[in-house]
Design a protein with these regions (language model features):
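A short, conserved, highly charged catalytic patch centered on acidic carboxylates
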Residues: 1-135, 142-143
């Protein structure tokens, strides 16, 4: 019985080590609320304008990562603090209002946004031989696919 209890304690300590603390959750919530407010206030602005708001949000919640464009990629989250590091995440960003036909949905997975994301991913992996790229995100400011 002591072994099971020790195992549970070890698991709990390990889970606690990776779980965000209450202050981190509060900071994330504050950043997310600020982001949603800015997007709602500027929902008819251009894609570039809204993408800047999204980038600011990402920079607040993802420390020590360089976030910017990379070639034709709307936003790239680099694996390091400079553009010299490899791209780890590709973000295909669409404007909140006015680009609905290009955005993925449950009824339209084969949308322009998805095809662009796949093309950028393949270019990173095949042409640039970037084996560090792990994720792709399609978003229109309010939903993530």
């Amino acid at each position: 019985m002591a072994t099971i209890q020790n195992l549970k304690q070890c698991i709990n300590r390990n889970v606690e080590a990776i779980m965000p603390q209450d202050d981190q959750k509060a900071e994330f919530t504050k950043s997310l609320e600020k982001y949603y407010k800015k997007i709602k206030e500027n929902k008819k602005e251009t894609e570039e304008f809204q993408k800047g708001i999204f980038r600011d949000f990402l920079e607040e919640i993802i420390p020590n990562k360089f976030i910017n464009t990379s070639g034709r990629i709307d936003l790239a989250i680099y694996n390091g603090e400079t553009s010299k590091s490899n791209v780890g995440v590709i973000v295909e960003y669409k404007r909140l209002v006015g680009n609905e036909s290009e955005m993925m949905s449950e009824n339209n997975l084969n949308a322009k946004a998805f095809r662009e994301l796949v093309a950028y991913y393949l270019r990173e992996r095949i042409i640039y031989k970037n084996l560090e790229i792990k994720k792709g995100i399609v978003t229109n400011a309010m939903s993530l696919s």
